[in-house]
């Protein structure tokens, strides 16, 4: 041992101190029994073991490890000397040396199926941790892949074995991928997704893209679609925070999901009741339209009218007009419906908007709905000297509906001929003679059928030169 030089560490500033540490350091780090017996025997055993080839090779590898350990310890001490005392690493050099030796020892072993543990300096995590994290993320329902959110939805009613072997499809909604078991859609066959992955796939109507993914629900946000997917699992849609009820309603209508109080749960009850009231108002007005309004429209149409003005009165209203002095505002052309229920229906502005949309869908035009004053009975008559007496009626505010079914309303107000310059000129040809040539309108460039019918019959060509006043020479 004395004649054999120790390896020199260029990073160490005190080689003699390292030799002294090397001889006095306990050598219990090696777990092999052969190395423990060599440590107990001392320097003479080192000389004997160096005579053998295999032991000499192991001794040289151990010396190389010692040199590398001294290099790490010296670099660690220099790094510690450069740090400020408040952030100095509290790990002692001896403990750090043990950690590094165990790391080198584990790396020198042959590879085994057991996964590596995460090192203190931030090395890669083990396969067990990654599998545990992946299972946790899948149970939470989301994980990130290449910057995009991927949500995994499983059917909770099926066991783990069925879920593992069941079919999965990937839906892309708003650049977000949803991995879903299509059986949850086929359980609701009346919805759009139920038809797509039910009869649509059977008849090859639903086709994926080149990556095998399905792009569905265009125009619907990913947050809304996540809430709608809960409907296929639990039968309830909980409105997410920040999503309005009209937006959720539009998505439900697009996906053919019934929007009912038993299906939708949200905190904004006012918005939910408003949507439910719109549905009820539509159904109610369609009933009123068929039972009360349409018969009056038919009566107006049978009399030759192409529009109808309807006033809704209550059941208690009494209309008593004076035949000698009727109202002078044209109310005599109005149709009257006595219905307190319809009066209460049109009292709300939202219901009038719903009724207007229904009438537009039915093809009617010039729709006006509102509340106006309607005369009910005569209160008094003011007689003016030398003039028409003034009649004062009692007016009540009642709803009214006005609509038209005139197809060519624009042409009825169009003048089809050139107006004459003066009322005294009754001959259109004479009036047209005074019109400049650039504004002259040719009335009938070709003879019409009715003109040919009234043309006088021409006499024979031989009688054209005879004087009608001359006497007949034969007489």
UniProtKB/Swiss-Prot annotation:
The compartments listed are: Nucleus; Cytoplasm
Q: Which residues form a coiled coil?
A: none
Q: What's any GO biological process attached to this entry?
A: positive regulation of phosphatidylinositol 3-kinase/protein kinase B signal transduction
Q: Where is the composition biased (Low complexity)?
A: 108-144
Write out the biased-composition intervals (Basic and acidic residues).
57-80, 97-107
Q: Where is this region: Interaction with AKT family members?
A: 146-475
**Broad class of the protein's primary localization:** nucleus
Q: Where is the composition biased (Polar residues)?
A: 81-94
Subunit description: Interacts (via C-terminal 330-amino-acid region) with AKT1; AKT2 and AKT3. Interacts with PPP2CA and PPP1CA.
Task: Report the PANTHER family cross-referenced here.
Answer: BTB/POZ DOMAIN-CONTAINING PROTEIN 10-RELATED, BTB_POZ DOMAIN-CONTAINING PROTEIN 10
Q: What is this protein called?
A: BTB/POZ domain-containing protein 10
Q: Which organism is it from?
A: Mus musculus
Source species taxonomy? Eukaryota, Metazoa, Chordata, Craniata, Vertebrata
């Amino acid at each position: 041992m004395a004649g054999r030089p120790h390896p020199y560490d260029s990073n160490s500033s005190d080689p003699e101190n390292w030799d002294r540490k090397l001889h006095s350091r306990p050598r219990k780090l090696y777990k092999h029994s052969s190395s423990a017996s060599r440590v107990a025997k001392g320097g003479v055993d080192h000389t004997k073991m160096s005579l053998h080839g295999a032991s000499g090779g192991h001794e040289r590898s151990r010396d190389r490890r010692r040199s590398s350990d001294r290099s790490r310890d010296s670099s660690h001490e220099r790094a510690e000397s450069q740090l400020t005392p408040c952030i100095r690493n509290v790990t002692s050099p001896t403990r750090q040396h043990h950690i590094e030796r165990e790391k080198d020892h584990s790396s020198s072993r042959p590879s085994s199926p057991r996964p590596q543990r995460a090192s203190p300096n931030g090395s890669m995590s083990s396969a067990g941790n990654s599998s545990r994290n992946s299972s946790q993320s899948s149970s939470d329902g989301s994980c990130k892949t290449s910057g995009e959110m991927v949500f995994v939805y499983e059917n909770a009613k099926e066991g783990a074995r069925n879920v593992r072997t069941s079919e999965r499809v990937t839906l892309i909604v708003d650049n977000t991928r949803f991995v879903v078991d299509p059986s949850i859609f086929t359980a609701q066959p009346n919805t759009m997704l139920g038809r797509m992955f039910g009869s649509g796939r059977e008849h090859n109507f639903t086709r994926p893209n080149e990556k095998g993914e399905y792009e569905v629900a265009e125009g619907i946000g990913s947050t809304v679609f996540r809430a709608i997917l809960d409907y296929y699992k639990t039968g309830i849609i909980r409105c997410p925070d920040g999503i309005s009820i009209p937006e959720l309603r539009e998505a439900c209508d697009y996906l053919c999901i019934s929007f009912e109080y038993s299906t939708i749960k949200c905190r904004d009850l006012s918005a939910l009741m408003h949507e439910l009231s719109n549905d009820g108002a539509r159904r109610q007005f369609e009933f009123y339209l068929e039972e009360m309004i349409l018969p009056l429209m038919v009566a107006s149409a049978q009399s030759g009218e192409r529009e109808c003005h309807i006033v809704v009165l209550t059941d208690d209203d009494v209309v008593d007009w004076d035949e000698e002095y009727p109202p002078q505002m044209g109310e005599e052309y109005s149709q009257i419906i006595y219905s307190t229920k319809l009066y209460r229906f049109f009292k709300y502005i939202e219901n009038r908007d719903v009724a207007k949309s229904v009438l537009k869908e039915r093809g009617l035009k010039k729709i006006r709905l509102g509340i106006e004053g309607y005369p009910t009975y005569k209160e008094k008559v003011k007689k003016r000297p030398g003039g028409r007496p003034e009649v004062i009626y009692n007016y009540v505010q009642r709803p009214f509906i006005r609509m038209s079914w005139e197809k060519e309303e624009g042409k009825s107000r169009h003048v089809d001929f050139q107006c004459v310059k003066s009322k005294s000129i009754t001959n259109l040809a004479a009036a047209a003679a005074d019109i400049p040539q650039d504004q002259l309108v040719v009335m009938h460039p070709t003879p019409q059928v009715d003109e040919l019918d009234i043309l006088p019959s021409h006499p024979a060509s031989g009688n054209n030169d005879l004087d009608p006043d001359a006497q007949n020479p034969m007489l």
